[in-house]
Regions:
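A short secondary-structure junction signal
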Residues: 10-15, 39-41, 72, 108
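Short, functionally important structural connectors and interaction interfaces within domains
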Residues: 16, 21, 39-43, 47, ...
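Glycine-rich, small/acidic residue-mixed loop/short-helix segments
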Residues: 27, 49-55, 59, 63-65, ...
Length: 153
């Protein structure tokens, strides 16, 4: 909604509070909304981020169309976006493991009320695990984002 900055807001917005940048980032991370610099950066594709409904395999020619059609048809994504939480501090680019093997990487992180939360790209073979380990043995709880559209479904 665009409003004139000098005009009064209409109800119900007038009685609400403006969201802070931190609150918006918390919402983005908790809901698994991928348009952040750690997720949409040229290193990932829309299917890994759960955006399969936003990809057309029928529409005209576009860069990557053939690759997207192949990935959709063969369930070929190597990793998928997941929400995570952990009581210990972790940062973007931290490597994740499962039973000592490479499992993924944190793409976004935020501390809120003593808990760390964020998004991570998790390798396909590790998606079923509810927990992964951070670089120093931290235990991360992993879950599929609410709005994630599984390219394999």
């Amino acid at each position: 909604v665009w409003c004139d900055p000098d005009a009064a807001l209409p109800e119900p917005w007038a009685s609400g509070e403006a969201a802070t940048a931190t609150a918006l980032e918390q919402w983005r991370l908790q809901s698994g909304f991928p348009p952040g610099p750690g997720e949409l950066n040229g290193e990932t594709n829309p299917l890994e981020l759960g955006l399969v409904a936003q990809v057309s395999t029928e529409k005209g020619c576009y860069l990557g169309q053939e690759t997207m059609a192949k990935l959709i048809g063969q369930a070929g994504v190597k990793q998928q976006l997941r929400c995570w939480s952990c009581p210990s501090p972790l940062a973007a680019a931290a490597k994740l493991t499962l039973d000592g093997e490479r499992a993924g990487v944190i793409t976004s992180a935020l501390e809120r009320d003593g808990t760390w939360l964020g998004l991570a790209l998790v390798r396909r073979q590790c998606l079923a695990s509810p927990t992964l380990e951070g670089p120093n043995g931290e235990q991360l709880q992993i879950r599929q984002p609410e709005a994630f559209q599984d390219p394999d479904a």
